[in-house]
Amino acid sequence: MLDIFRGLKNLVKISHVNTDSPVFRLHYSITVMILMAFSLIVTTKQYVGNPIDCVHTKDIPEEVLNTYCWIHSTYALKSLFLKKVGSEVPYPGVGNSDGKNIDKKIYKYYQWVCFCLFFQAILFYTPRWLWKSWEGGKIHALMMDLDIGICSEIEKKQKKKLLLDYLWDNLRYHNWWAYRYYICEFLSLVNVIGQMFLMNRFFDGEFMTFGLDVITHMEADQEDRMDPMIYIFPRMTKCTFYKYGVSGEVERHDAICILPLNVVNEKIYIFLWFWFIILTILTTLTIFYRIIIIFSPRMRVYLLRLRFRLVRRDAIEIIVRRSKMGDWFLLYRLGENLDSIIFRDVMQDLANRLHNNQHHRVPGMKGEIQDA
């Protein structure tokens, strides 16, 4: 098991340059690694053995029957899930059928789980890929190795001046750059909600309330309720195989199939249900947080003061008052990457320059001061 995660840690590396939020990293780093690990686990015989084992008479070769039932779907009977195991049925959902398809629950997902998990991992990484493309290495370029703070005073002074000149010359031109990141965060929210609906479709409408059903089942009298994990992920199902008999007539053969992979699948998807709910809540709160930041300069001042206590309050207020939301976002990202003393000096120098130059050029009308 550890070998799988060792192989994945290089696949989803977190850069030492911080260009996004912790919640955003949960999507493209932790979640992607979890999904990729699950995808590999369900394809590894070392952990689950053969994916399907069907039992029948010797008239049908075992490999033929297993292959047929793996390629086609297996089924259970809905009316038999509440029957008493051991006296009425051998296993929930398994028993004699009347040949009608009305009562059948077909399990079509079984062989597609690993591919679905892999596809989900790609979808979770897509907003990160988009932001990397849009961010363009701006933060790393502006850092100029000022994050370590170990360089000569002359070199440090030159780099701080270059950074200050860039901020001065491009002040109020970073809104679209910041909005692109907010779009990526919103796409992460759309993705995780969309994947809940995707998995609900994948499991024939049984996934959306899966976690709640499991909790309800654990709290109720289990003799009176259907186990949702057994209902969605049965260990034993039936498979119908047709072949010609010795007289040329079509013969129907019912086989019992053991699905050992579902022991793993149920754990995977009960975890993913709760994990996706947590991600949805955290990302929704993050989106509301971003909306407040966009429309509230006071909140931007408060957050900078809270995060970077070495920077003087009056310097922060001057910068926020004379800049836009995109500049705030860039400065916040720089502050999380630069040496704290260097960032304090840059912020103070920028505030002094803004204070001494009241007519700094502004896009739009001359002399206009915009808060957003």
Swiss-Prot record:
A GO CC term? gap junction
Entry's localization field: Cell membrane; Cell junction, Gap junction
Which residues does the entry place in the Extracellular compartment? 43-105, 204-267
Give the record's membrane topology: Multi-pass membrane protein
Q: Give the Pfam families listed for this entry.
A: Innexin (PF00876)
Q: Which domain of life is it from?
A: Eukaryota
Instruction: Tell me the InterPro entries matching this sequence.
Output: Innexin
Gene Ontology molecular function, alphabetical:
gap junction channel activity; photoreceptor activity
Q: Which GO terms describe its biological process?
A: gap junction assembly; monoatomic ion transmembrane transport; response to light stimulus
Stretches assigned to the Cytoplasmic side: 1-21, 127-182, 289-372
Q: What does this protein do?
A: Structural component of the gap junctions at electrical synapses in distal and mid-depth levels in the lamina.
The entry's family comment says: Belongs to the pannexin family.
In Swiss-Prot or TrEMBL terms, this protein is called: Innexin shaking-B
What's the source species for this entry? Answer: Aedes aegypti (Yellowfever mosquito)
